[in-house]
Amino acid sequence: MTDSPADLRSAFRSGRVTPTAGLAPGFAQTNLIAVPQDWAYDVLLFTQRNPKPCPVLDVGDVGSRETVLAPGADITTDLPLYRVWKDGELADETADVSGLWRDDLVAFHIGCSFTFEHPVAAAGVPLRHVEQGSNVPMFVTNRECRPAGRMSGPMVVSMRPVPEHQVSLAAAISARMPAVHGGPVHIGDPTELGIADVAAPDFGDPVNFEPGDVPVFWACGVTPQAAVMASRLPFAITHAPGYMLITDIPDSEYVLEVPDAR
């Protein structure tokens, strides 16, 4: 029996630490970035100007640890792993940030590509990182995001090896889910994104290719963390890459209906 989102959040609250790819199939997952209220407009504008890597699914009230995406959840304890940033530098990685939370923080929940993995897998497309029990590999690219106020930085992408004959299928399925990054931003040669070695990700784990696999790159919600570093935010709390908030929202809620052509 598959654990429910609530069961998994409870396990994370109790100390279980694991990447969330492949967990609670059928339910949306989100990236988290929480910043001081003084920076919240900059972040909001940055996400609005860069919707491909930063599709916002919810913004919390100032100081709130709650989200409508997971009623009853505490976003300071119910993700498996967090990162704490000070002056743009990684200060800590911890499974509980409840003691670091501040009354002036505003939390942004950003769509995650793990959400479209369930329908992609259901269509018969293999997910190599799930098969291999690893985190998805993520890379900082040479594509700069559109700056907003004090926020700027490069786009981050996730990479999945896909059998060449199934690339168009994976692209079409994900393209119907723009709230969780939509279709790929690049297919094939990683050097066009400034990625020298797909076996050496900036975040996550390396993944092994099978014969006939092609690297496919999707915009990634770790992009705000790259902006935190580039913009040297004085303080921020984020998820650790690959360790997401598992919500109660079915992934089907984020699938665009295709108009009837008749």
From Swiss-Prot:
Pfam families xrefs: D-Glu_cyclase (PF07286)
InterPro entries named in the record: D-Glu_cyclase (IPR009906), Putative_hydro-lyase (IPR038021), UPF0317 (IPR016938)
Record EC number: 4.2.1.-
GO MF entry, a single one: lyase activity
UniProt key word Lyase: yes
Top-level EC class as recorded in UniProt: lyase
Keywords: Lyase
SUPFAM superfamilies, per the entry: PSTPO5379-like
Lyase is among the record's keywords: yes
Cross-referenced NCBIfam families: PRK05463.1
Family label: Belongs to the D-glutamate cyclase family.
HAMAP family xrefs: Hydro_lyase
PANTHER family xref list: D-GLUTAMATE CYCLASE, MITOCHONDRIAL
Full protein name: Putative hydro-lyase RHA1_ro03475
Native source species: Rhodococcus jostii (strain RHA1)
